[in-house]
Amino acid sequence: MLTVETLERPEAATDEWLRLGVRIVVTGRGGANSQTVLQQVLALFWPVAELYDFYATPYPRLPDATVLRIAFDLPAGYEAGVSGIVQSIGGAGWTVDIYEDGEQAACWKPEDGAVRPLCDHFHSAEINLIPSSHLAEFRKSAAPRLLQ
């Protein structure tokens, strides 16, 4: 079972925010590798984002692999965008897409010349940055309150 330890922070409500969704495939038996990657990702984004949700499931395409799905809520004023997120995670070989509607995405796969981000257990990843106005109403009402 994966665990998360976070510090208490004062919160203030905002009307607009960004949902950061991170989906990472982690290799290796047991939960140790997944726990390590989860803690690394939390350390990268906890200073600027609120943890919304996370869970892990087996990855059916690769034996002994786990899919980590981690969601954060960022203040609307977060200007670094998905490119800044990719830079924080590191590695090389990311494919970044920025759409006209404000959504942003990035993908990393172990292909020619790609430099693995975070650790050797990092198999692949997808990142999505979605404005709160694009989320379904039930997702908006469940959102945590964010720092101003």
Range-by-range predicted roles:
Residues 36, 51, 55-56, 99, ...:
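Generic marker of "main functional regions" within proteins
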Residues 7-18, 48-63:
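Short edge beta-strands and adjacent turn/loop segments
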Residues 25-26, 33-46, 55-73:
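Long, low-complexity, intrinsically disordered polar/charged segments
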Residues 44-48, 62-148:
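Charged interaction segments
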Residues 1-42:
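Short, extreme N-terminal segment that most often corresponds to the first beta-strand
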